[in-house]
Amino acid sequence: MIRLHRPQRPPLRAPLRATPSLSLRWRVMLLAMSMVAMVVVLMAFAVYAVISAALYSDIDNQLQSRAQLLIASGSLAADPGKAIEGTAYSDVNAMLVNPGHAIYTAQQPGQTLPVGSPEKAVIHGELFMSRRTAGDQRILAVHLQNGTSLLISKSLKPTEAVMNKLRWVLLIVGGVGVAVAAVAGGMVTRAGLRPVARLTEAAERVARTDDLRPIPVFGSDELARLTESFNLMLRALAESRERQARLVTDAGHELRTPLTSLRTNVELLMASMEPGAPRLPEQEMVELRADVLAQIEELSTLVGDLVDLTRDDAGQVVHEPVDMSDVIDRSLERVRRRRNDIHFDVDVTPWQMYGDAAGLSRAVLNLLDNAAKWSPPGGHVGVTMRQLDPSHAELVVSDHGPGIPPQERRLVFERFYRSTSARAMPGSGLGLAIVKKVVLNHGGMLRVEDTVPGGQPPGTSFYVLLPGRPLPPAGHSTPAGESETDKAEAATDPAVPVAGDTANSRESANVISVDSQSARAR
């Protein structure tokens, strides 16, 4: 017995919980508070260091001045004891050391002038002068020329009291500064983020009520530009919904007419087959069946056109090398079966594209059907493809039909648009829209002109610019009547711009020449 061991799938990881986060207003306010607190702390340290250095420097200057005054007066040599006693007062202590003879001291009650290693080095003559802080006293020791040493100290308690008060003042002022910065930051943040709040409310309103009204724009700063971008998005969404609603409405209208006619014919057929019902003449039965089949075919074509036009299957379409000569030949075979009274003048240069073969075939077939439908019986339809440059060729499909009025040229590629003269002709108004979509998806361009400008009738010519590369001739002849002048004019024609990539061409609205845009709705 064979057992199949299926690999165990790792357990699914539980979704991460949404962690609470501070609002943008609080984050901006905390950032402002942090910056102010940092500046306050740095300034407090700087002020404290400067004032502390100034106070200690002042004490050193006082001790230095008193020592110089005693030395310059000569009282230390005349009466050292009295001079030392006169020097010591308040918070100052003094000492005169004469090695081998005597030591004179004058100290305040409760204070003792400390003698450490620096002072001993001065007394022994190893150092000329020393200054240091010992405990709560600042000590100055000076070695005199006669071998004696003068030591003077001053209490630092008054200075420490001042520094303590300074620390409290800096702490209070810094705290008040941070608090003021927090309040001011909150007010500024609230005022600065008011447009963001309006934008947020508008987005929530759209999500809640589907209200696509634009948001008022104030100023010209970054938030104003953000609001304008949001308004553009709202307008695009409104236009998309409008197009969607119009598509549904138009599709329903276009489907209603053949469905109504089909239903009427089917009901008539069913009624004629009821027992006891009068039989329809055979000729009428044949015509009725033909009408039903024609209406079913019309419905199938309309539904297929709608599916091709509305679906976005860019990720499912297989792109492959496509020989446009074969595409044109197959399309011509299908059109000739429907309109065998039309003469097609074909002059095609072998050309290869990389794209969707089915989509390109549908676009070419729609162009040929369009030209054949509007050509009079026995008329001629021209189908030419010529190379413009190493990477672009131009397909031209021309007829000698009635043409299109200039005021309708901007509308012929819209879905379901049909001109007044086209309403009496069969069709759904989707053929040219499909052509436009396919051409743009393949990085091509469209332009439409009169076949015979000023003629009666003027006819219509569709010019399709297609990217690709030439193929060596294989059973197809190159255009014989094309001169070098024609090639130069085609290469420099300003109405034939070179298409960019597919994405850019798909989004461009100006791919159809405005001045020369003419076609008829099918």
From Swiss-Prot:
<feature type="domain" description="Histidine kinase">
    <location>
        <begin position="250"/>
        <end position="470"/>
    </location>
</feature>
<dbReference type="InterPro" id="IPR036097">
    <property type="entry name" value="HisK_dim/P_sf"/>
</dbReference>
<dbReference type="InterPro" id="IPR003661">
    <property type="entry name" value="HisK_dim/P_dom"/>
</dbReference>
<keyword id="KW-0904">Protein phosphatase</keyword>
<dbReference type="InterPro" id="IPR005467">
    <property type="entry name" value="His_kinase_dom"/>
</dbReference>
<keyword id="KW-0902">Two-component regulatory system</keyword>
<feature type="compositionally biased region" description="Polar residues">
    <location>
        <begin position="502"/>
        <end position="522"/>
    </location>
</feature>
<dbReference type="GO" id="GO:0005524">
    <property type="term" value="F:ATP binding"/>
</dbReference>
<feature type="region of interest" description="Disordered">
    <location>
        <begin position="468"/>
        <end position="522"/>
    </location>
</feature>
<dbReference type="InterPro" id="IPR003660">
    <property type="entry name" value="HAMP_dom"/>
</dbReference>
<keyword id="KW-0346">Stress response</keyword>
<feature type="transmembrane region" description="Helical">
    <location>
        <begin position="168"/>
        <end position="188"/>
    </location>
</feature>
<keyword id="KW-0843">Virulence</keyword>
<keyword id="KW-0378">Hydrolase</keyword>
<dbReference type="GO" id="GO:0000155">
    <property type="term" value="F:phosphorelay sensor kinase activity"/>
</dbReference>
<keyword id="KW-1133">Transmembrane helix</keyword>
<keyword id="KW-0597">Phosphoprotein</keyword>
<keyword id="KW-0812">Transmembrane</keyword>
<feature type="topological domain" description="Extracellular">
    <location>
        <begin position="52"/>
        <end position="167"/>
    </location>
</feature>
<comment type="function">
    <text>Member of the two-component regulatory system MprB/MprA which contributes to maintaining a balance among several systems involved in stress resistance and is required for establishment and maintenance of persistent infection in the host. In response to environmental signals MprB acts both as a membrane-associated protein kinase that undergoes autophosphorylation and subsequently transfers the phosphate to MprA, and a protein phosphatase that dephosphorylates phospho-MprA.</text>
</comment>
<feature type="modified residue" description="Phosphohistidine; by autocatalysis">
    <location>
        <position position="253"/>
    </location>
</feature>
<dbReference type="Pfam" id="PF02518">
    <property type="entry name" value="HATPase_c"/>
</dbReference>
<keyword id="KW-0460">Magnesium</keyword>
<keyword id="KW-0418">Kinase</keyword>
<dbReference type="GO" id="GO:0004721">
    <property type="term" value="F:phosphoprotein phosphatase activity"/>
</dbReference>
<dbReference type="InterPro" id="IPR036890">
    <property type="entry name" value="HATPase_C_sf"/>
</dbReference>
<dbReference type="Pfam" id="PF00672">
    <property type="entry name" value="HAMP"/>
</dbReference>
<keyword id="KW-0464">Manganese</keyword>
<keyword id="KW-0547">Nucleotide-binding</keyword>
<feature type="topological domain" description="Cytoplasmic">
    <location>
        <begin position="1"/>
        <end position="30"/>
    </location>
</feature>
<feature type="topological domain" description="Cytoplasmic">
    <location>
        <begin position="189"/>
        <end position="522"/>
    </location>
</feature>
<protein>
    <recommendedName>
        <fullName>Signal transduction histidine-protein kinase/phosphatase MprB</fullName>
        <ecNumber>2.7.13.3</ecNumber>
        <ecNumber>3.1.3.-</ecNumber>
    </recommendedName>
</protein>
<keyword id="KW-1003">Cell membrane</keyword>
<dbReference type="GO" id="GO:0005886">
    <property type="term" value="C:plasma membrane"/>
</dbReference>
<dbReference type="Pfam" id="PF00512">
    <property type="entry name" value="HisKA"/>
</dbReference>
<dbReference type="InterPro" id="IPR050980">
    <property type="entry name" value="2C_sensor_his_kinase"/>
</dbReference>
<keyword id="KW-0472">Membrane</keyword>
<feature type="domain" description="HAMP">
    <location>
        <begin position="190"/>
        <end position="242"/>
    </location>
</feature>
<feature type="transmembrane region" description="Helical">
    <location>
        <begin position="31"/>
        <end position="51"/>
    </location>
</feature>
<dbReference type="InterPro" id="IPR004358">
    <property type="entry name" value="Sig_transdc_His_kin-like_C"/>
</dbReference>
<keyword id="KW-0808">Transferase</keyword>
<keyword id="KW-0067">ATP-binding</keyword>
